[in-house]
């Protein structure tokens, strides 16, 4: 069962679902809009070796970031051109990880799905690749996987970036996500890189 606008407000008011900050204007008919934070991660590795910890750098914007498509062949000259013409804080190429401003806590009988906004999809920008599912019992901010597929796109801090759809489980989970010892992304307070190297890889 998907929660309606009335259900979402009721769950938040009764603190069964925590959304901080919460804006009643962001409640849709059966979703809640979330906004883009100011911290991002860019990977430094030539190859993603998923058995090892990945190298990355964190960046923080004051206002905006320009995301160029994959294999855009970005040069220093082009970066300086974009910064001067469009007054952006950073220019990046390829995938970049972002985060929501919103911190959420879900009870063990509510799961959620993150979906990018249709308006961003219409300029061929995605804000999640495969990680749209949020397990019951999750606590933390949502890490976003941002990729532009056509032209460079300027994103602004605090703009609406996507929405959460909440579903009620038939019965509560015995162990919620943030209670599991194997959960790698519980209580994340900002953007987090992939921690897949912590998985138990079976070697033949």
UniProtKB/Swiss-Prot annotation:
Catalysed reactions, semicolon-separated: dCTP + 2 H2O = dUMP + NH4(+) + diphosphate
GO-annotated biological processes: dUMP biosynthetic process; dUTP biosynthetic process
CDD domains reported in the protein's UniProt record: trimeric_dUTPase
UniProt: dCTP binding residues: 117-122, 128, 132, 135, 143-145, 163, 177, 184, 188
Gene Ontology molecular-function annotations: dCTP deaminase (dUMP-forming) activity; dCTP deaminase activity; nucleotide binding
pH and activity: Optimum pH is 7.5.
Site, Important for bifunctional activity: residue positions: 132-133
Pathway annotation from the record: Pyrimidine metabolism; dUMP biosynthesis; dUMP from dCTP: step 1/1
Active site: residue positions: 145
EC numbers: 3.5.4.30
Regulation: Inhibited by dTTP.
Keywords: Hydrolase, Magnesium, Nucleotide metabolism, Nucleotide-binding
Cofactor list: Mg(2+)
Pfam families per UniProt: DCD
Impact when changing residue 135 to N: Loss of activity
Top-rank taxon, per record: Archaea
Temperature and thermostability: Retains over 70% of its activity after heating at 90 degrees Celsius for 10 minutes.
Annotated InterPro entries: dCTP_deaminase, dUTPase-like_sf, dUTPase_trimeric
Stated role: Bifunctional enzyme that catalyzes both the deamination of dCTP to dUTP and the hydrolysis of dUTP to dUMP without releasing the toxic dUTP intermediate. It also acts as a dUTP diphosphatase with a lower affinity for dUTP than for dCTP.
Subunit structure: Homotrimer. Two trimers assemble into a hexamer by stacking on top of each other.
Family: Belongs to the dCTP deaminase family.
Name assigned to this protein: dCTP deaminase, dUMP-forming
Native source species: Methanocaldococcus jannaschii (strain ATCC 43067 / DSM 2661 / JAL-1 / JCM 10045 / NBRC 100440) (Methanococcus jannaschii)
High-level lineage: Archaea, Methanobacteriati, Methanobacteriota, Methanomada group, Methanococci
Gene field: dcd
